[in-house]
Amino acid sequence: MGLKGEKYTSDAALMGAVAVGRQDALSVVLDRYMPMVSRVSYRILCDRCDSEDVTQEVFIKIWRNSSGFDGRYSLSTWIYRITCNLCYDRLRRRKVLSIFSIAPPVYETSCPVALSPEEDFITKETWEIFCRASRNLSPKQRAVFTLRDLEGLDTEEVAAVTGLTADQIKSNLHIARKNIRQELERYGKVR
């Protein structure tokens, strides 16, 4: 018996099956991309509840818009783009709500648990500092930093996801790295 999803030989075939309501195809998409969507949304939002909400919204959007997948980009790029756009929306909504709130915004600062084996080295304190620093970044800077430095996408892939040019990516990445480094230095986490 083959691996789950083995019969879908391309992203287009997989999304075509999702578009016609194939439950097994949707399960393949969920299995393949749920960890990535959860990880990226959590890294951008620094809030577990918001991340869980965005993750659900991403897969609802994939299901509803599956017939709109045209294959110009890889499925992972399309899903990264949906994830980032929903994160931008959430960050904008968070900013608007904070304007009308008397209390300061509350952000979860707990260290990500079991997001990936590579992240085991992140301590709770370092994660708190990272989240604090990332709040000072624009949504685009957060996304570029997350996609490029934390997810390991190359500049061309980041451009496909964000719609930014290579120069804009470099500029946003430089600003994000500088701000995060300054915050880490302030707390003695980087020399």
Regions found by a protein language model. Name each.
Residues 13-17, 129-137:
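Short amphipathic alpha-helical boundary/capping segments
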Residues 2-5, 19-28, 38-57, 166, ...:
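Short, charged helix-capping/linker segments at alpha-helix termini
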Residues 144-148:
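A short pre-motif secondary-structure segment
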Residues 130, 141, 156, 160-186:
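DNA-recognition helix of helix-turn-helix
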Residues 19-20, 46-47, 59-74, 94:
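Sigma70-family region 2
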Residues 39, 53-60, 73-85:
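Structural recognition of an alpha-helix C-terminal capping motif at a helix-to-coil junction
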